């Protein structure tokens, strides 16, 4: 197959940052995706509808001329989020979900939830108005092995949460384990998951090949090969409970290559080419459009896009670095040659 035509996809988990960084990275996302669920972990985080509206406006102002893009906003859940804020979020029309970060779990999550059980009144309100909950599904207990934190979160917090709020729509984001796949498969239609390109392409060996490879470091961290294989099977199965979410997370090279490097992989530049590489290797290119273009909007109860994009068999090399404010930005798998190339349909 030399060419694939797909309905224009959406990214259901994206970090855009703010200010000059936003202006630097947004064009990459806008080129490939029609919409994106935008993460709220700025400094300070996006905690209210008013803050989400202001951030929404800043994103719209940064869209390159001649491009169309719809940012789908989220609120950052804290111990102090109120049911009234949830009602306002639902009524806003542009806030599409609420994001749960365990305090300290990942970049800019210090103000996250200290105990998920403190948020039951908020979850009740979300269930009532049908506003989805997006989960960074890891525990932060330092006694739990970093490779086990997703599994422990599912057993300790997610199963009880689902039992307490059976009608709450939940997205377990950037899943990394066979345990997460099995939980989603065993749950009803109100539970779904996003999967990143890095967790489909690589296992934890990639972080340590010939030394420390900081540009493969993300959270949740890459896992062993058996987990990657389970994710691959889920993503390419055609099951609508699994859909595209890049978790593209830009950090300047100096923030990645340091004695305390930041977690995150930048894939917005070449996300669809990476996913196509994965699906082709699995002999499942016929399943790519559902994963990338259909299952996400269906879960979020939004219309599917009508525009088309193409991927053609055109070899090209991922750049070693991209421009970024006061630094440079190293894309995921920098220097690698890919055989698929993205193009919009004229």
Swiss-Prot record:
GO terms for molecular function: dihydroorotase activity; zinc ion binding. It comes from the Bacteria. The keyword Hydrolase applies. Keywords: Hydrolase, Metal-binding, Pyrimidine biosynthesis, Zinc. The active site is at 247. The modification N6-carboxylysine is found at residue 99. One of its GO terms (cellular component) is cytosol. Zn(2+) 2 binds at residues 99, 136, 174. Pathway: Pyrimidine metabolism; UMP biosynthesis via de novo pathway; (S)-dihydroorotate from bicarbonate: step 3/3. It catalyses: (S)-dihydroorotate + H2O = N-carbamoyl-L-aspartate + H(+). Binds 2 Zn(2+) ions per subunit. Gene3D superfamilies: Metal-dependent hydrolases. Its cofactor is Zn(2+). Its EC number is 3.5.2.3. Substrate binds at residues 15-17, 41, 136, 219, 251, 263. Zn(2+) 1 binds at residues 13, 15, 99, 247. It is an enzyme of class 3 (hydrolase). GO terms for biological process: 'de novo' pyrimidine nucleobase biosynthetic process; 'de novo' UMP biosynthetic process. Pfam families: Amidohydro_1 (PF01979). Catalyzes the reversible cyclization of carbamoyl aspartate to dihydroorotate. Belongs to the metallo-dependent hydrolases superfamily. DHOase family. Class II DHOase subfamily. Homodimer. This is Dihydroorotase.
């Amino acid at each position: 197959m030399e060419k694939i035509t797909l309905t224009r996809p959406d990214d259901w988990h994206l970090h855009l940052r703010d200010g000059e960084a936003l202006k630097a990275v947004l064009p990459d996302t806008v080129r490939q995706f029609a919409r994106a669920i935008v993460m709220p972990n700025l400094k300070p985080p996006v905690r209210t509808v008013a803050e989400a509206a202001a951030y929404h406006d800043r994103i719209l102002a940064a869209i390159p001329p001649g491009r169309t893009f719809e940012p789908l906003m989220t609120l950052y859940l804290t111990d102090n989020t109120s049911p009234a804020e949830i009602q306002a979020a639902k009524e806003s029309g542009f806030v599409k979900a609420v994001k749960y970060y365990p305090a300290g779990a990942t970049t800019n999550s210090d103000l996250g939830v200290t105990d998920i059980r403190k948020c039951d009144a908020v979850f009740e309100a979300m269930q009532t108005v049908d506003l989805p909950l997006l989960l960074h599904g890891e525990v932060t207990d330092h006694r739990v092995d970093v490779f086990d934190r997703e599994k422990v979160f599912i057993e300790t917090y997610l199963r009880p949460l689902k039992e307490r709020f059976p009608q709450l729509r939940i997205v377990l984001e950037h899943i990394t384990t066979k345990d997460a796949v099995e939980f989603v498969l065993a749950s009803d239609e109100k539970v779904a998951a996003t999967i990143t390109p890095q967790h489909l392409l690589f296992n934890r060996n990639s972080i340590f090949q010939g030394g420390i490879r900081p540009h493969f470091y993300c959270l949740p961290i890459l896992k062993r090969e058996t987990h990657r294989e389970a994710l691959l099977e889920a993503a390419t199965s055609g099951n609508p409970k699994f859909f595209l979410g890049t978790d593209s997370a830009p950090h300047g090279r100096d923030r990645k290559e340091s004695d305390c490097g930041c977690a995150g992989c930048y894939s917005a530049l070449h996300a669809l080419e990476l996913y196509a590489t994965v699906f082709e290797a699995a002999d499942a290119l016929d399943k790519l459009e559902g994963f990338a273009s259909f299952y996400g909007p269906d879960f979020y109860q939004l219309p599917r896009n009508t525009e088309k994009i193409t991927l053609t068999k055109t070899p090209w090399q991922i750049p070693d670095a991209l421009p970024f404010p006061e630094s440079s930005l190293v894309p995921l798998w920098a220097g690698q040659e890919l055989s698929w190339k993205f193009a919009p349909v004229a």
